């Protein structure tokens, strides 16, 4: 009797562990490759319409995926080798211009202006990813990942790999955390309470409390797993990348994993008119996955 009870409990626990995956993905849906003609895709960002912009970083290009037609068109071939991107409230595409050590803002004609060039009069290492809070605050990671396609000075520019804050309308970065080992993907909660940061070399995800002045407190390890880019859904689930896409609930429990048949899955965001299409950048390709949950 005891053995049967233990077996029943084990089966129930397994079912419960698997159930959340079925609760976030639309029935019968699996990742679908929509294009595969790139060198290395990165930085997906969704605009107000639901279209997704993404980079082909080695080829210095940004592309736009039309959420209605599925068509992909070139947005610009002068991207500053942009990595992570995010749309601001005014509809500008904010991009981490990795090769130029800068943060850029693109209008919808593909013209850019420079938002940030340095910290304390020294160039940044190479901005990697950015998240914008609802109040217009920017949070930016600046690790040092030397690229073989850089044509600029490839030396490390900053003594640390920093996590930075940029106040709304400001142009001077504020250091938030100088102790990180290759900070990478970054995303915050829509209520502005928490910030998640991937620490690549430490192979973990950190969570901070965001204060009213934009500063961070109460740093904690959220998950013992690294990530490249990240995103969040309307239930507070966090989507990590690298070996496919792995999903953690807001309590830090792993609830799903979506294998992607590529060497590396670099980044992810929610697109589509209803923000229910998970858009995945993975090596030379991009994929979509229809979800039950929605992006923010």
Report each predicted region and the residues it spans.
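Sequence-structural signature of mature extracellular/luminal beta-sheet repeat domains
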Residues: 16-296
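Sec-dependent signal peptide recognition
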Residues: 2-8
């Amino acid at each position: 009797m005891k053995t049967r009870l233990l077996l029943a409990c084990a089966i129930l626990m397994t079912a419960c562990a698997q159930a959340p995956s079925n609760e976030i993905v639309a029935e019968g849906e699996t990742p679908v490759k929509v294009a595969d003609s790139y060198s290395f895709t990165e930085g997906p960002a969704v605009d107000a319409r639901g279209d997704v912009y993404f980079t082909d970083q080695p080829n210095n290009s940004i592309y736009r995926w039309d959420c209605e037609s599925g068509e992909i068109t070139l947005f610009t071939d002068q991207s500053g080798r942009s990595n992570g991107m995010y749309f601001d409230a005014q509809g500008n595409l904010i991009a981490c211009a990795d090769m130029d050590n800068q943060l850029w803002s693109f209008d919808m004609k593909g013209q850019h202006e420079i938002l940030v060039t340095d910290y304390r009069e020294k160039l940044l290492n190479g901005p990697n990813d950015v998240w914008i809070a609802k109040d217009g605050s920017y949070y930016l990671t600046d690790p040092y990942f030397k690229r073989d396609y850089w044509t600029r000075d490839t030396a490390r520019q900053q003594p640390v790999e920093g996590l930075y804050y940029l106040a709304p309308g400001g142009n001077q970065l504020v250091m938030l955390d100088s102790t990180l080992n290759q900070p990478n993907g970054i995303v915050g909660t829509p209520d502005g309470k928490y910030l998640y940061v991937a620490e690549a070399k430490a192979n973990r995800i950190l969570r901070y409390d965001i204060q009213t002045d934009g500063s961070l407190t109460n740093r904690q390890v959220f998950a013992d797993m690294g990530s490249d880019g990240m995103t969040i859904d309307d239930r507070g689930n966090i989507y990590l990348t690298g070996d496919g896409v792995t999903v953690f609930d807001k309590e830090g429990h792993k609830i799903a994993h979506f294998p992607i048949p590529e060497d590396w899955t670099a980044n992810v965001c929610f697109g589509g008119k209803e923000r229910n299409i998970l858009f995945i950048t993975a090596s030379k390709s991009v994929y979509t996955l229809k979800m039950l949950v929605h992006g923010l």
